């Protein structure tokens, strides 16, 4: 009885990935089927706040610790966190059997509204239209949002469309983008019990 029950349990969708370069040292641990718990330390306060949105709204347990060359700027740290997070997601997803594959979300915050659509297609691609109203959000360079998502898609092997439809406050714009990204991920990463052993593509592979 115990053996049968254990055999019927789905494999945990977890991963741990480290990236060490001359510019950054990063470790990402995650559980795609978590409850949104997070432990985050990148040295960039606003970026930690955005990563927390991914954990909380994606219901992903996320542990990210990064040490980077912030005496230069945040570029390498933000981009490399995106790369490492993408690698961890790809590892945790595995063969994609039963995956819903597609996810989308609209998220508002006061005057700001963003839409994000994701496809675990196996083909990296980013289309991002976010006209930030300010170059800096705290100590976070708003241009680095693009670098984060580009790093993520290249290594998670997803197609990602991000559109900020309305917004006058850069903080609100960024927050709606990251929250919508999280909720789109949550949808796409769900397992469809009706197709639990099927790869969601007519090709038979992704």
Swiss-Prot record:
Keywords: Amino-acid biosynthesis, Cytoplasm, Histidine biosynthesis, Lyase. One of its GO terms (biological process) is L-histidine biosynthetic process. Pathway: Amino-acid biosynthesis; L-histidine biosynthesis; L-histidine from 5-phospho-alpha-D-ribose 1-diphosphate: step 6/9. Gene3D superfamilies: Imidazole glycerol phosphate dehydratase, domain 1. Its EC number is 4.2.1.19. GO terms for molecular function: imidazoleglycerol-phosphate dehydratase activity. One of its GO terms (cellular component) is cytoplasm. The keyword Lyase applies. The keyword Cytoplasm applies. Belongs to the imidazoleglycerol-phosphate dehydratase family. NCBIfam families: PRK00951.1-1, PRK00951.1-5, PRK00951.2-1, PRK00951.2-4. This is Imidazoleglycerol-phosphate dehydratase. It comes from Polaromonas naphthalenivorans (strain CJ2).
